[in-house]
Amino acid sequence: MKTRIITALLIIVCVIPPLVYGGWLIDLLIAFFIVAGGIELLNLKEQDTAWPIIIKPLAIAAVFVLVLSDERLHTALLGICALVFLSIPVFTDRFHAKDGFLCIAYITFFFAIARCFLHIYETNRMYVWFIIIATYACDTAAYFCGRFLGRHKLNVRISPKKTWEGSIGGWFFGAVLS
């Protein structure tokens, strides 16, 4: 419990200033999410062979280029990314077509998330606060409902401590508090 509280406080300290002041701080926050998410997602690859060292930085850089580019270039740039990542297996045995598709999925997903976040933020900053409050309400309620009422495991293979009761409690309180 102490770890959860410390983590929550650190997240609050890191997220609130960018949301309040905007500008380059919000760009830095989005950059952090792109890099952290990229590392997490690209590490999902089965470790049968190590990728060439340039792959992960190239995929992360591709997301930044897309986010910062002119909207008219997005389709062409996504096409170039697909071509590049699906061509790499021709030149190395350590990177396969399925790895290329994983990189393309990462680039597309995080580009879309970053664009959506920026659009929501530019439309009305209060929407971002709404999303944060709903997320924390859902997560906190799920934790406590699962801890005190949880009897039926949700999916032990994915997360051994998650319960149906916690999941339903999280959904309910997330909806009520948002």
Where would I find each of the regions flagged by the language model?
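Membrane-embedded alpha-helical bundles of polytopic integral membrane proteins
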Residues: 1-163, 167-178
